[in-house]
Amino acid sequence: MVKMSKQLRIAAPVEPVVVGKMGSAYGIRGWLRVFSSTEEAESIFDYQPWFIKRAREWQPIGLESWKRHNQDLIIKVRDIEDREAATLLTNCEIVVDASQLPDLDSGEYYWKDLLGCQVVTVGGYQLGEVIDLMETGSNDVLVVKANLKDAFGIQERLIPFLDGKVIKNVDLAAHIIEVDWDPGF
């Protein structure tokens, strides 16, 4: 079990990023399962403070401690003392400010930065907008919502994020991802 330090006056996130989600209550003493969206599950604890949104307001979440139980990560939230109180946090997204995230090497991207980018083939065909990403184990996959006037009648495309092979260029400033991809797929 890892004890967490207390946080003093905490500013709400300026650029909120979801790093996980609170799961079901665990036991009767206010513990909860947590589902991490970070590459290494335990890395979620490196990004503090955590916030949840309640009644359209950011609320900081103070972690008292955490531990691994079998395959799950279990957390104890400060001032949550019983199962009933813990259950109220179930399904709350865990948010941190983007400034907490480490800088990436060239050619590496946070999913949050790819969302909303327009995807264009090397031939100039507009495939659509990145609306989601999926992790498949072998590589990440862009979920691209096709343009309304798509000539192929496709509503959604799944494009593997294979740098150099499929992904030819990522221009985050222009929000454009250039791909070598057949528009018919």
UniProtKB/Swiss-Prot annotation:
Main location: cytoplasm
SUPFAM superfamilies: PRC-barrel domain, Translation proteins
Subcellular location: Cytoplasm
Gene3D superfamilies associated with the record: PRC-barrel domain, RimM
InterPro entries, alphabetized: PRC_barrel-like_sf (IPR011033), PRC_RimM (IPR056792), RimM (IPR011961), RimM_N (IPR002676), RimM_N_sf (IPR036976), Transl_B-barrel_sf (IPR009000)
GO terms, molecular function: ribosome binding
Pfam entry (one): PRC_RimM
GO biological process: ribosomal small subunit biogenesis; rRNA processing
Domain PRC barrel: 106-185
Keywords linked to the UniProt accession: Chaperone, Cytoplasm, Ribosome biogenesis, rRNA processing
GO CC terms: cytoplasm; ribosome
Entry similarity comment: Belongs to the RimM family.
Known partners and oligomeric status: Binds ribosomal protein uS19.
Function: An accessory protein needed during the final step in the assembly of 30S ribosomal subunit, possibly for assembly of the head region. Essential for efficient processing of 16S rRNA. May be needed both before and after RbfA during the maturation of 16S rRNA. It has affinity for free ribosomal 30S subunits but not for 70S ribosomes.
Record remark on domains: The PRC barrel domain binds ribosomal protein uS19.
HAMAP family: Ribosome_mat_RimM
Descriptive protein name: Ribosome maturation factor RimM
The encoding gene: rimM
